[in-house]
A protein has these predicted regions:
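N-terminal active-site beta-alpha-beta segment that forms phosphate/nucleotide-binding
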Residues: 2-171
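Conserved phosphate- and dinucleotide-binding cores of soluble alpha/beta proteins
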Residues: 24, 30, 35, 45, ...
Length: 257
């Protein structure tokens, strides 16, 4: 089954079931608080007014550009990126992959997700949900053809909260991240909420790209249309750098310091 050709909506052709209310979350999930951000990495870290304004203006311009793509351009981008993702060695060797559901003109990952479901029985796919306890953080839940979905406060579909479906972020081998803008240095401009930066702050503190538990930190892969590239992004102290960026025309990989 093919995904919706438009990248600007949340409609999909998957067999997931939509629901209108959220399942009651039991104590184990509510108690799972993510690692706290150190003061030097706090989202409240000071940045100049000029940088804040520049990021806001750039975000507005790039969001308008990607929403302006035609349905055919969105479909072509989704197919090409799905093909490119399947060639990434570290993704092919992974067992748990996290992604996202399309919103606001983002690249649609449905082609890739369905290919994982159909051909890779040893791989688990996960989606982010707004954390029910820690404001501004994400929680990851497993996602299958039969997952029930509900729209969050941003009108984005996400799996219904359930303890048994929680996937700890440190168990994710790869996280495919939406973005608003990027540059060739691996910097990412998001929607401005800071959800990914807070949730993934531990990847910046992990020595030798490893988390404190000794397991490898997840590979962070930005997914974007080519028109979302800029010469140089204004970088904030809390921004989490990417390991790779995949667009319809190329794949960029980076070495973190």
């Amino acid at each position: 089954m093919s995904p919706s050709s438009s990248g600007s909506g949340t409609s999909r052709s998957l067999t997931s079931n939509k629901v209108n209310s959220t399942e009651t979350v039991s104590a184990p999930v509510l108690a799972m608080k993510p690692t706290q951000i150190a003061p030097s990495q706090s989202i409240q870290t000071s940045v100049s007014i000029e940088d804040i304004q520049a990021r806001a203006q750039l975000r507005k311009k790039l969001r308008e550009a990607r929403r302006g793509l035609t349905n055919q351009q969105h479909t072509d981008a989704a197919k090409r990126i799905a093909s490119r993702l399947r060639t990434l060695p570290f993704l092919d060797n992974s067992t748990t992959i996290a992604g996202y559901l399309v919103n606001d003109g983002e690249v649609n990952l449905t082609y890739f997700i369905e290919s994982i479901w159909q051909s890779s029985h040893d791989k688990k796919f996960a989606l982010p949900v707004l954390h029910p306890v820690c404001k501004g953080h994400l929680l990851f839940l497993s996602y299958t053809q039969h997952s029930q979905l509900v729209k969050n406060k941003y009108n984005i579909e996400e799996p219904v909260l359930s303890c048994k479906n929680v996937v700890p972020v440190r168990q994710c081998d790869v996280i495919l991240m939406p973005l608003v803008g990027f540059d060739v240095n691996g910097n990412r401009l998001g929607m401005g909420g800071g959800y990914y930066d807070r949730t993934l702050s531990f990847t910046q503190r992990a020595p030798d790209s490893h988390s404190f538990s000794g397991s490898k930190a997840p590979k962070l892969v930005g997914i974007a249309h080519d028109i979302q590239e800029v010469d140089a992004l204004p970088v904030a102290p809390w921004d989490v750098p990417l390991d790779a960026i995949v667009t319809p025309s190329r794949t960029l990989q980076f070495t973190k310091p």
